Amino acid sequence: MITAIINARIKSERLKEKHLYKIGHKTIFEHIIDNLLNTSLINEIYLATGPRNNNYKYEKFFKSKYKNKIKLFYYNNEFDVTGRVFNLTKKIRNKYTLLVSGDCPLIDKGFIIRLYNLIKLNPSKSFILPPKKIIHEGIKIFKTDAWQNV
């Protein structure tokens, strides 16, 4: 199974609170989460964000919209994305983790399945990168324990 991490913070530099903006009738977060929930390989979803006092609005949104389906991970350093993901992976028990950029609403179930199959077929690899630039550039899969080597 796969744990998905959505990486986002409310105070992004160019467009604050962009994850709560709507595309059609859904917010960017809703597009991402609905597609992740529709992928049977994913059994756990985290939002990895900065300090709670800066990002509490996300917690309110997720509790009202998704009840207990999304776990929140707060990390005190707003700008240390690597540290945020590293520390969160210590809590994850699944063998594989999917890292999703919070401003990437183009989540495709078929693409996730292909990434998962690629990493399973290549047991010596810790992560899989697509061979060329694609529209899903905000999505990466890796072995969760690979972060212990960082």
PLM features per residue range, with description:
Residues 108-133:
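Conserved donor-nucleotide/metal-binding helix-loop-beta segment in metal-dependent transferases, i.e.
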